């Protein structure tokens, strides 16, 4: 008999870590991605406003953890509407919010699969979502993870919703040059919040508690790129505040924030041949020995490594893509200083700014799969209607707390 209950760190930690070690993320028989949660199984949800971890337990006398699932709830943007009360010649668009739940970290021990344990964990988590007022639930998985896709879109009633791209770039042994034609400005959290709320609050999945994200200890800063020589790029003291900046923006600009995943979890690629390991090590040795050559090197992903996540990427103007590229170079150098192996970002597949995000195709995922489910039929469609049936926008806001 399988019992599903809330995770208890005082007695479940060893069992949960054992299941994590037995499970792999990625197609079986190929390179697999393992996650070291650094002794904290709820590290990927603990920064969310509301979260829960459940475990599946089997046995009577000798009980064994055979599966687990994590979930969290927050309020996000799901659409937009015109502000009819705004007295101005220009239309003002306001965000429409919904309470959204996120399912992640579903694991079932390889020795106990095909017994309905995963389905039971999902249903119990969804019940907690409903009890806490969530209107929608979504999950992220790989397109080729057929077992996961079948479980959620088949048995659990989810539908395919969005296919963003995960873009991953290695951190080299040398620093990357930031364009001399660009000035990078670090914003205070309150200024970053103002900028994001004014310009990006109508972006799909934008978290209503963006202030909590930006003030979190894992958020390493928000950076704005402007043309050098513009009134905002002339040196210290030239930043007038985000509201004034957006009222009189330069011809082109971009913004990006950085989240330190390294202090929450480490990753490791397993299953690589000896030849791959030797080639990767050789490129790193050459890069470190001759950094002036600026040769790209394969990161040490075959041993535990950390990452920085770039989020809140946006910008405007004809040179916005180049501005994003400069911000990514700055983020790379932050990651190098922080001892990370890679930097990553997740953006909508059609986002024009993705062209400014350097990445290695072999490390990236062109189509991550997000599936969504409406949790209750008793919710009125309201202004936004049924979000699960809405067309994708040009961009999305990926919450770093859930990456």
Curated annotation (Swiss-Prot):
Gene null: resulting phenotype? Unable to develop apical hook in the dark. Reduced length of dark-grown hypocotyls and reduced leaf initiation rate in light-grown seedlings.
Q: Does the keyword Transferase apply?
A: yes
What is the protein's known function?
Ethylene-responsive N-acetyltransferase required for differential cell elongation in the hypocotyl. Regulates apical hook formation of dark-grown seedlings. May control differential cell growth by regulating auxin activity. May be involved in negative feedback regulation of auxin homeostasis through the control of GH3-like genes. Modulates de novo shoot organogenesis.
Q: What is its EC number?
A: 2.3.1.-
Name the species this protein comes from. Arabidopsis thaliana (Mouse-ear cress)
Query: Biological process (GO) annotations?
Result: auxin-activated signaling pathway; photomorphogenesis; response to ethylene; unidimensional cell growth
State whether keyword Phosphoprotein applies.
Answer: no
Which CDD domains has this protein been placed in?
NAT_SF
Q: Tell me a Gene Ontology molecular-function term this record carries.
A: N-acetyltransferase activity
Q: Could you tell me what induces this protein?
A: By ethylene.
Name of the molecule in the record: Probable N-acetyltransferase HLS1
Which ranges carry the N-acetyltransferase domain? 2-177
Q: Which SUPFAM superfamilies match?
A: Acyl-CoA N-acyltransferases (Nat) (SSF55729)
Q: Which UniProt keywords apply?
A: Acyltransferase, Growth regulation, Transferase
The similarity comment for this entry is: Belongs to the acetyltransferase family.
Using the chain's own numbering, where are the disulfide bonds? none
């Amino acid at each position: 008999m399988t019992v599903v209950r809330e995770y208890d760190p005082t007695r479940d930690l060893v069992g949960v870590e054992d299941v994590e070690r037995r499970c792999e993320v990625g197609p079986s028989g190929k390179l697999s991605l393992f996650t070291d949660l650094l002794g904290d199984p709820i590290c990927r949800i603990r920064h969310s406003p509301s979260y829960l971890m459940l475990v599946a337990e089997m046995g009577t006398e000798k009980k064994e953890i055979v599966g687990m699932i994590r979930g969290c709830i927050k309020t996000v943007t799901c659409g937009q509407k015109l502000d009819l009360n705004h007295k101005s010649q220009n239309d003002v668009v306001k965000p429409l919010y919904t309470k959204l739940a996120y399912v992640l970290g579903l694991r079932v021990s390889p020795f106990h699969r095909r017994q309905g344990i995963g389905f039971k964990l999902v249903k119990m988590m969804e019940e907690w979502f409903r009890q806490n007022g969530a209107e929608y639930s979504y999950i992220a998985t790989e397109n080729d993870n057929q077992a996961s896709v079948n479980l959620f879109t088949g048995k659990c009633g989810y539908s395919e919703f969005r296919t963003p791209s995960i873009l991953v770039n290695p951190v080299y042994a040398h620093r990357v040059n930031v364009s001399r034609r660009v000035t990078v400005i670090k914003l205070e959290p309150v200024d970053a919040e103002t900028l994001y709320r004014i310009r990006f609050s109508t972006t799909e999945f934008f978290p209503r508690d963006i202030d909590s994200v930006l003030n979190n200890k894992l958020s390493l800063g928000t950076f704005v790129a402007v043309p050098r020589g513009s009134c905002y790029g002339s040196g210290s003291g030239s930043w007038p505040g985000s509201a004034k900046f957006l009222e009189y923006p330069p011809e082109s600009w971009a913004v990006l924030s950085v989240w330190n995943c390294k202090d929450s979890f480490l990753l490791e690629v397993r299953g690589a041949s000896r030849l791959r390991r030797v080639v990767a090590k050789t490129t790193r040795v050459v890069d470190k020995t001759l950094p002036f050559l600026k040769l790209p090197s394969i990161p040490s992903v075959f041993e535990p490594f950390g990452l920085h996540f770039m989020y809140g990427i946006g910008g405007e103007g004809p040179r916005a893509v180049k501005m994003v590229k400069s911000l990514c170079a700055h983020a790379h150098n932050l990651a190098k200083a922080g001892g990370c192996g890679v930097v990553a970002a997740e953006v909508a597949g059609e986002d024009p700014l993705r062209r400014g995000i350097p990445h290695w195709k072999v490390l990236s995922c062109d189509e991550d799969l997000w599936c969504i489910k409406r949790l209750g039929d008793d919710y009125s469609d309201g202004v936004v209607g049924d979000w699960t049936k809405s067309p994708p926008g040009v961009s999305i806001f990926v919450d770093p707390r859930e990456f």
